[in-house]
């Protein structure tokens, strides 16, 4: 969170196991399928995706849990093209500015492998599945269909990329 820029994290939910170095409520809210069912029954699910992983089904979802107050703050979140389109439908196009962060495939795979090696029990098959699924989910055609035109390169440092994003968001707020 950067108070000077009023850019707050928008944290999604997942049923996947927490990885080494992650913190509940920072990268994701880590919940079980029972909690997901409760949120479904309460009508709180904005969007939901299920991935058939090597370890079984994992759900990623966005819930209307009160963390978003568009009248007071701007938010930065991570998601797929599918989740972006559903969030845009829920909050309204005027509330959403897509920021597409792209990374060279070789670098993305290298970073994923480095991250996976640090896990207590690395799951390389799942890492490969995720990489290939992302290649399918983020084709140029699908990016264009989602109406995303602005891209940010994350081929150098994450700090450089985030600084570029912050500057872009500031310019958008002035429009």
What do the predicted segments below correspond to?
Residues 5-7, 92-97, 145-149:
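Short glycine-/polar-rich loops that comprise or flank the Walker A/P-loop
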Residues 14-75, 79-81:
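ATP-dependent small-molecule kinase phosphotransfer cores
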Residues 10, 29, 97-99, 150-152:
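Hydrophobic/aromatic beta-strand patches that form the interior of the parallel beta-sheet core
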Residues 74-80, 91-116:
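Conserved phosphate-donor/acceptor-positioning beta-strand/loop module used by diverse small-molecule
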Residues 117-172:
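Small-molecule kinase domains that catalyze NTP-dependent phosphoryl transfer to phosphate-bearing small molecules
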Residues 2-19:
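Short beta-strand-centered segment that lines the nucleotide-binding/catalytic pocket of NTP-utilizing
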Residues 19-20, 85-87, 106-112, 160-163:
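Switch/connector loops and helix/strand junctions flanking conserved nucleotide-binding motifs
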Residues 21, 66-71, 89-94, 142-144:
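Conserved catalytic network of the ASCE P-loop NTPase/AAA+ motor domain
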């Amino acid at each position: 969170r950067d108070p000077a820029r009023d850019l707050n994290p928008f944290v999604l939910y997942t049923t996947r196991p927490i990885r080494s170095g992650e913190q509940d409520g920072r990268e994701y809210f880590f919940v079980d399928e029972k909690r997901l069912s409760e949120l479904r029954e309460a009508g709180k699910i904005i969007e939901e995706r299920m991935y058939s992983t090597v370890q079984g089904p994992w759900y990623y979802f966005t819930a209307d849990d009160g963390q978003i107050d568009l009248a007071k703050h701007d938010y930065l979140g991570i998601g797929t093209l599918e989740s972006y389109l559903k969030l845009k439908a829920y909050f309204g196009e005027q509330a959403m500015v897509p920021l597409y962060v792209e990374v060279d495939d070789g670098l993305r795979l290298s970073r994923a492998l480095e991250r996976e090696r640090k896990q207590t029990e690395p799951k390389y098959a799942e890492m490969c599945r995720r990489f290939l699924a992302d290649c399918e989910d983020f084709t140029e055609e699908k990016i264009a269909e989602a109406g995303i035109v602005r891209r940010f390169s994350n081929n150098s440092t994450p700090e450089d990329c985030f600084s570029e994003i912050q500057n872009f968001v500031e310019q958008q707020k002035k429009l």
